[in-house]
Amino acid sequence: MIVLPRKYGKASRKCSRCGDHSALVRRYGLMLCRQCFRELAPKIGFKKYN
């Protein structure tokens, strides 16, 4: 059985840091899940405003 890579849908993209498929932040080409984004956001220049 040959398994082809996904071309569309949730399983076609994964977090570039941990490999998770859920809750991806794709904006600006980040490709990070939300947990990794929250850890890395201050280092990559994102600021939290109230």
Curated annotation (Swiss-Prot):
GO terms for biological process: cytoplasmic translation. GO terms for molecular function: rRNA binding; structural constituent of ribosome; zinc ion binding. GO terms for cellular component: cytosolic small ribosomal subunit. Its cofactor is Zn(2+). Keywords: Metal-binding, Ribonucleoprotein, Ribosomal protein, RNA-binding, rRNA-binding, Zinc. Binds 1 zinc ion per subunit. InterPro entries: Ribosomal_uS14, Ribosomal_uS14_arc, Ribosomal_uS14_CS, RIbosomal_uS14_euk_arc, Ribosomal_uS14_sf. It comes from the Archaea. The keyword Membrane does not apply. Zn(2+) binds at C15, C18, C33, C36. Binds 16S rRNA, required for the assembly of 30S particles. Belongs to the universal ribosomal protein uS14 family. Zinc-binding uS14 subfamily. Part of the 30S ribosomal subunit. This is Small ribosomal subunit protein uS14. It comes from Methanothermobacter thermautotrophicus (strain ATCC 29096 / DSM 1053 / JCM 10044 / NBRC 100330 / Delta H). The gene is rps14.
